[in-house]
Curated annotation (Swiss-Prot):
EC number: 2.7.11.24
Regulation: Activated by phosphorylation at Ser-189.
Keyword terms of this UniProt record: ATP-binding, Cell cycle, Cytoplasm, Kinase, Nucleotide-binding, Nucleus, Phosphoprotein, Serine/threonine-protein kinase, Transferase, Ubl conjugation
Organism lineage string: Eukaryota, Metazoa, Chordata, Craniata, Vertebrata
Chief place of localization: cytoplasm
Motif FRIEDE motif positions after renumbering to this chain: 332-337
Name of the protein in its database record: Mitogen-activated protein kinase 6
Family: Belongs to the protein kinase superfamily. CMGC Ser/Thr protein kinase family. MAP kinase subfamily.
Amino acid sequence: MAEKFESLMNIHGFDLGSRYMDLKPLGCGGNGLVFSAVDNDCDKRVAIKKIVLTDPQSVKHALREIKIIRRLDHDNIVKVFEILGPSGSQLTDDVGSLTELNSVYIVQEYMETDLANVLEQGPLLEEHARLFMYQLLRGLKYIHSANVLHRDLKPANLFINTEDLVLKIGDFGLARIMDPHYSHKGHLSEGLVTKWYRSPRLLLSPNNYTKAIDMWAAGCIFAEMLTGKTLFAGAHELEQMQLILESIPVVHEEDRQELLSVIPVYIRNDMTEPHKPLTQLLPGISREALDFLEQILTFSPMDRLTAEEALSHPYMSIYSFPTDEPISSHPFHIEDEVDDILLMDETHSHIYNWERYHDCQFSEHDWPIHNNFDIDEVQLDPRALSDVTDEEEVQVDPRKYLDGDREKYLEDPAFDTSYSAEPCWQYPDHHENKYCDLECSHTCNYKTRSPSYLDNLVWRESEVNHYYEPKLIIDLSNWKEQSKDKSDKRGKSKCERNGLVKAQIALEEASQQLAERERGQGFDFDAFIAGTVQLSAQRESADVVDKLNDLNSSVSQLEMKSLISKSVSREKQEKGRANLAQLGALYQPSWESQFVSGGEECFLISQFCCEVRKDEHVEKENTYTSYLDKFFSRKEDSEMLETEPVEEGKRGERGREAGLLSSGGEFLLSRQLESIGTPQFHSPGGSPLKSIQATLTPSAMKSSPQIPHKTYSNILKHLN
């Protein structure tokens, strides 16, 4: 037993001395870890909640929770026995001493189970649900009379003893004081209630709410006890509001206009008749229970029953006894809120000078910097003398904060009678991890800092967004793999684009050099015609002989044109022969003799060379295409030039020399391509593939980069 106790002390950091033994983990509260232990002084099992004090925010939450639970004393609220420091030391009444500690322990009443575990077994009988609902309302009446908002009511925070069927409200880690005599609009924290139990007003105005938010959560819990499942289980705020609008009527026109300005795509002209009323969601319940629930789950908080009014409803008359439903005799007021601010002001500088642990793994950048007080503490009262801009740190629940900032659509309203409740999600990429908010809550961008989620929708394309579809479970690993694959593809395509551009530049330079060389060697026919026209326009003079001599010299130049043309044709024929050799045409050793003897072959080769130059000119004007596409298109043209049948033996020999496609459709390696030394690829059949730059001239091929083709798709397309 001693070894087990020491191991728990080391693993979880519980340091309470030898008084408390047999520690067992129970779960996580609003802002701490909860264990059960046996108190050796009274031999009784208790629940111990450890709150780690690491920064001013945690100190503020601990101060607030301790202040509230010390004053609350009710049969339906979990009792607190004592508050201890490290090693089980007793704390003084001065709560300011917490700033000198690194942790605090709250020893409270141990309960057998919670309502969430009970509902996992199935729905409750209506009589049991009514009994638990009465106790919940009885506790809420006392809490609200003390000017306290719980702000985190859910089945996991309602504890039950199954022997006597007693229900008690616990976990006040997110509770706060709110004096109803002062306005708190704009100075309340956002999104503290678990999403499934948030009221419509809390979804529309996260910074402006009242005690009615606890009543909405109580109504959702009552419906869950009757059905065994969550009443409104939305994946995000938009879907949560959508589910509410399907079942809860919007009676007031001002509420409909507010919804119309925020989410017009889901708003109809008549919202008083929901598509799925509560009678469909809760089949089989009594009429009195349905009427009771409909008066609690109202869209407008002004129409919602308070805890005291709900206890007076006829459905609760079987248990209701006003004289046994006490209220707080010492409620909190605005002074208690201001005292928290002043206390934090006095100890603010001291908190930041806490010594770091020697084995702490946090860097200087990991410690939050707070230059102002918390916005949650400021009220519209002259006694609140602080200008606060920081926001309250929101505690995380495993079922909260399951979505990012992409939550609302600001689309043009589509008013018609056909109301579609299906949301339109355009992005299929998503990842799934049900504990995403515990792992990446600081980067998920879910905890919005705007006055209203639904009023200020911004599609943030520059930031990583983890949710594109309404999912309750997200997979962070899939998202990381998808983002890695996308970055690899982008890098690869960029590299290939750079290589193709270089090849295109080399091809254009080679074509320009060839054109300049042809212009330098040819006969200037335009100059000859211009001189002849100018000479014929002039009158004959005495110096006729000299002009005739000039004319004769021009004629002699014209006669030399045929000789020059022959040399040019010969050069073109040689170039065409080289191109045909590179393109894999049938190479014949007696090329010269065939050109001299066969006039038809000479004409075809000249025509082919002209078509090649024409194709190059067209390609310069059009958009760039892959060099493999050019290669295969020219190969098809060269195959059309074959007019004479070739013997089967010679054809096989020439195919091996040229390195083109064999009859089986496989790529063979030619001697010319081996000399180029291009990188190799592997086809699905296992035969090696090489990048081919046959369209470049020999001079350009020496300087052009050897770049592999990015896929086999273009090659296989030409094969087919």
